[in-house]
């Protein structure tokens, strides 16, 4: 039906007869001439109808936005004065000789001249996806997956599918359960990741595996999360953590070069401890120049409990954040930042406004200055390298609250004051995570997942001091987003059972949930390591949007609903009966 795409016509096509198929993006009726912007997935081209083709001109008068049409005509060069530099096809236009209206469109529920609500866009997603910016994002996503497949194939990886209907295993979030009709009362789980299957593939001898795969997690959603999402899943045998990072870094550098024309260069490597200390985050945005500075040792003897308490507590921390030019902040802005850090558990926000260092105490403005002598203040200014016109904010509490609150404040202030260089790309690897973290109930939980290997520890050493264990894990971070994470896996049965035990999984439960894995570990398991990238998040970064729903064709809302199909929906009672399922309504409180 077509010979060319609208958006691909150029000066090289001048004089050619072409047939185009697409939609009316806009129509302009000048009486004797009618112009339309005709759109398809590749872009927009101007088509015009003149009186010499009377039948086509008459039919064109009926056109409205989003009519689906076919046009045959001749490509012509525009006059110099009519060239549109804002359009890829702006140097040419098509003189229509024939027009076919394939399908008319009712009054549109979306307004192309105004910003539509996200709810409306999701309800009429098939219309929203016609917009050039949305089409471009999905084209970029398709290009990314194509580049990934070619790269992985060139590096000896095999694309192997793993099951969608599997067994529920504890991986951190709730599972989506699928009832079995054949096995009454039993349920499959949709996979949160192919983690165990890809490890089993390593045990099967397929030493380089990858898959672009759907994963499912029934968790509370945020703006950058979906209940179903896509991973670029990778696993290798007989490769060390640095070797895995080298190949995966090469993949991401390849994507940025091909999609953005940007060479990311070598990625710096930073430990978890350093990232938390300097940036208050395990996914630091290195485009922001500000860092946290420890000042507890300067404040242990002050008669100000807010500082002295955490400064003398082994689990406490006092950190300073020097904000270049921050002395210009108003009292209202400072109060707003004080309320902001309370979201993260901080009790407030102390500060020193540096007006003129040379004047000593008279050159600063601070509600806590009365608790600090000139010598201590000077030491703080020296350590933070504060200059005239800067602001120093303080966080004082337990280490986690200080990291969370001051790390978030660093990001917010950096954005608010334009200190974060939005034109840069800042990738890095974060390594050496704690293997376990406090679960809040006196126990431990795996920081990544229970199949991550400890670094340089035997099973006996791990059992004796799990709180000291460092995971042989690594995350890739770009511009403050964790785009991928992985680890060296446990390939020894004793070590795996030790980790399960530390996590409070008794032997009976181990056999029930992971018996197949423990059995497989008995038969010559190779050392293996892997990583998974979030395809949605990678695409988000490469297309310049901060909304993950913009890079998924048919996404869910933050309530995990599809407004277009109205999923989830109630099931047919007969279907439920066949599955031996009964829906029980909770009694309302009187």
From Swiss-Prot:
Binding site for L-aspartate: 171, 217, 448, 489
Region (Aspartate): 195-198
GO biological process, one term: aspartyl-tRNA aminoacylation
Native source species: Escherichia coli O157:H7
HAMAP family: Asp_tRNA_synth_type1
Localization in the cell: Cytoplasm
Keywords: Aminoacyl-tRNA synthetase, ATP-binding, Cytoplasm, Ligase, Nucleotide-binding, Protein biosynthesis
Gene Ontology terms for molecular function: aspartate-tRNA ligase activity; ATP binding; nucleic acid binding
Protein name (Swiss-Prot/TrEMBL): Aspartate--tRNA ligase
Subunit-level organization: Homodimer.
GO cellular component, as recorded: cytoplasm
Catalysed conversion reaction: tRNA(Asp) + L-aspartate + ATP = L-aspartyl-tRNA(Asp) + AMP + diphosphate
Coiled coil: none
């Amino acid at each position: 039906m077509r010979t060319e795409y609208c958006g691909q016509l150029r000066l090289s096509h001048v004089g050619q007869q072409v047939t185009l198929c697409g939609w009316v993006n806009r129509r302009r009726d000048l009486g004797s001439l009618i112009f339309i912007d005709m759109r398809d997935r590749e872009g927009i081209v101007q088509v015009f109808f003149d009186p010499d083709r009377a039948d086509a001109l008459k039919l064109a008068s009926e056109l409205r936005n989003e009519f689906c049409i076919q046009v045959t005509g001749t490509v012509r060069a525009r006059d110099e004065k009519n060239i549109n530099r804002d359009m890829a096809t702006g140097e040419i236009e098509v003189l229509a000789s024939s027009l076919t209206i394939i399908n008319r469109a009712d009054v549109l529920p979306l307004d192309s001249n105004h910003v539509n609500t996200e709810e409306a866009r999701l309800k009429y997603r098939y219309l929203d996806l016609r917009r050039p910016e949305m089409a471009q994002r999905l084209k970029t996503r398709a290009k990314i997956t194509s580049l990934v497949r070619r790269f992985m194939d060139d590096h000896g990886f095999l694309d192997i599918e793993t099951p969608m209907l599997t067994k529920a295993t504890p991986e951190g979030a709730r599972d989506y359960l699928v009832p079995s009709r054949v096995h009454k009362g039993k349920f499959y789980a949709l996979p949160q990741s192919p983690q165990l299957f890809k490890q089993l593939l390593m045990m099967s001898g397929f030493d380089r595996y990858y898959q672009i795969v759907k994963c499912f997690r029934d968790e509370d959603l945020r703006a950058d999360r979906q209940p179903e999402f896509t991973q670029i899943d990778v696993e290798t045998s007989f490769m060390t953590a640095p070797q895995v990072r080298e190949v995966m870094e090469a993949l991401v550098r390849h994507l940025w070069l091909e999609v953005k024309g940007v060479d990311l260069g070598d990625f710096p490597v930073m430990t978890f401890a350093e990232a938390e200390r300097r940036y208050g985050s395990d996914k630091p945005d290195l485009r922001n120049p500000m860092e946290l500075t420890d000042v507890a040792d300067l404040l242990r003897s002050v008669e100000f409990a807010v500082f002295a308490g955490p400064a003398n507590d082994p689990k406490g921390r006092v950190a300073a954040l020097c904000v270049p030019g921050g002395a210009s902040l108003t009292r209202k802005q400072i109060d707003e930042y004080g309320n902001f850090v309370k979201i993260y558990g901080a009790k407030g926000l102390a500060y020193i406004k540096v007006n003129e260092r040379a004047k000593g105490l008279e050159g600063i403005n601070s509600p806590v200055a009365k608790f600090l002598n000139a010598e201590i203040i000077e030491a703080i200014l020296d350590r933070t390298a504060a200059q005239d016109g800067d602001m120093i904010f303080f966080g004082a509490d337990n280490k986690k609250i200080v990291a969370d609150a001051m790390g978030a404040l660093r990001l917010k202030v950096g954005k608010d004051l334009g200190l974060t260089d939005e034109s840069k790309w800042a990738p890095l690897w974060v390594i050496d995570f704690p293997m376990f973290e406090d679960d809040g109930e006196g126990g431990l939980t795996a920081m990544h997942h229970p199949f991550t290997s400890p670094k340089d520890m035997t099973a006996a050493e791990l059992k004796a001091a799990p709180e000291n264990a460092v995971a042989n894990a690594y995350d890739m971070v770009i511009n403050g987003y964790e785009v991928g994470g992985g680890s060296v896996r446990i390939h020894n049965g004793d070590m795996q059972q030790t980790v399960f035990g530390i996590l409070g999984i008794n032997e009976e439960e181990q056999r029930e949930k992971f018996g197949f894995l423990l059995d497989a570990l008995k038969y010559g398991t190779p050392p293996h390591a892997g990583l998974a990238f979030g395809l949605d998040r990678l695409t988000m970064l490469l297309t310049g949007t901060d909304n993950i729903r913009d890079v998924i064709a048919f996404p869910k809302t933050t309530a995990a609903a599809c407004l277009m199909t109205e999923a989830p929906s109630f099931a047919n009672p007969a279907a439920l009966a066949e599955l031996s399922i009964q829906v029980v309504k909770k009694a309302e409180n009187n």
